[in-house]
Amino acid sequence: MDAEEPADALHIANSIPAHIDSLEASSDEAEIAIADAEAALNSAEGELALSNAERLAEAKEAFAKGDAPLAKGLADSLAREVRETSDAMQEVQRALRQKKQISDRFPTGQASQVWQSRLEEVETAASSGKWLNASQSLTSLTNDLASYESEASEARELLDFVQSEWLSLIHI
């Protein structure tokens, strides 16, 4: 009887209900994640929905095979990516509708061409459906433009100060 190790057997038997509860919870979480991913995919447009339909099928297949953690991971990843891409798409489309206001902030002269080409890169990425790249390029462009405007404003203030000081020295 000592060879049977009844204490270990009792310990294992007592842990089974907790393990089953854990599996059920994992299964419930996976079902919710798959439903969320499906909803996100249904709200997605065009190519985004088509390119991710296979990933949703993989999540459902993993769930059907009893691999709830894999199914949940795949579904969560899919839902997150679809939402990020949709958000990026909306941000870029909104900005491109205001393209004229963005272009009006560009400096004049040769520097304007550099800024214009950066805006065209955003448009190219958007037209090819690379919304995350377009969003990153747009963010970089607007941050750099804000920085440029700040530096230009500081330079103008310094120039105004120097000119006023120069005029006061001339009139002494």
Q: Locations of the language-model features?
A:
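Repeat-associated, polar segments at repeat-unit boundaries in modular proteins
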Residues: M1-I34, A64-Q93, G129-R156
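C-terminal modules of long, charged coiled-coil scaffolds in eukaryotic assembly complexes
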Residues: Q116, W131-A134, L145-A146, D160, ...
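Conserved small/polar residues in nucleotide/adenosyl-binding loops
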Residues: I170-I172
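Disulfide-bonded cysteine-rich modules in secreted/extracellular proteins
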Residues: S26-A44, D87-T108, E151-W166
